[in-house]
């Protein structure tokens, strides 16, 4: 089935005529939502369509998803760029899942038109511009610095955008 999330299936009969079916499902780790449609990806980067009867509770990445695929696409990303981008997102999601503090703090992961990531925290009005999906440890350390040094001095609602994608700096905008 083109819409299935089945990773592997085996069927066989025994000598007494009993039919045995073994199914292994794909486990989604992230959900992509764009104006082109929605898809899941598993830990290997395999992309498959959303299911009508079930929604997995996984991080949602929305916005300008840079994948040129149809709504019912099932397979690995088509180009080197798409593969690298999906791998970056999977690394990002894995980083969030391994760091409970950040997993609980991030409400939304949004993709800008240039493919860069913006995260929206559950608390506060600022949006954090992450840039490319790489160097997460450094970027989240800058977010910690923002809360540790800038918020106490300027106030919690002083900025709406905080860019942590630049090397060695935090750029705040009202």
Per-region residue spans from a language model:
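Charged, solvent-exposed interaction patches on well-folded alpha/beta domains
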Residues: 8-174
């Amino acid at each position: 089935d083109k819409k299935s999330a089945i990773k592997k299936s085996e069927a066989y009969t025994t000598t007494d005529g009993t039919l045995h079916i073994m199914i292994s499902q794909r486990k989604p780790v992230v959900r992509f939502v764009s104006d082109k449609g929605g898809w899941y990806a598993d830990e290997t980067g395999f992309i498959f369509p959303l299911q009508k009867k079930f929604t997995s509770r996984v991080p949602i990445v929305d916005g300008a998803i840079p994948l040129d695929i149809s709504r019912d696409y099932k397979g690995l990303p088509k180009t080197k760029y798409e593969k690298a981008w999906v791998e970056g997102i999977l690394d990002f999601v894995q980083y969030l899942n391994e760091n409970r503090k950040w997993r609980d703090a991030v409400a939304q992961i949004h993709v800008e038109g240039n493919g860069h990531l913006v995260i929206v925290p559950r608390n506060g009005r600022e949006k954090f511009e992450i840039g490319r999906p790489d160097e997460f440890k450094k970027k989240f350390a800058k977010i910690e610095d923002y809360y540790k040094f800038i918020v106490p001095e300027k106030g919690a609602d002083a900025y709406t955008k905080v860019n942590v994608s630049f090397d060695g700096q935090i750029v705040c905008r009202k």
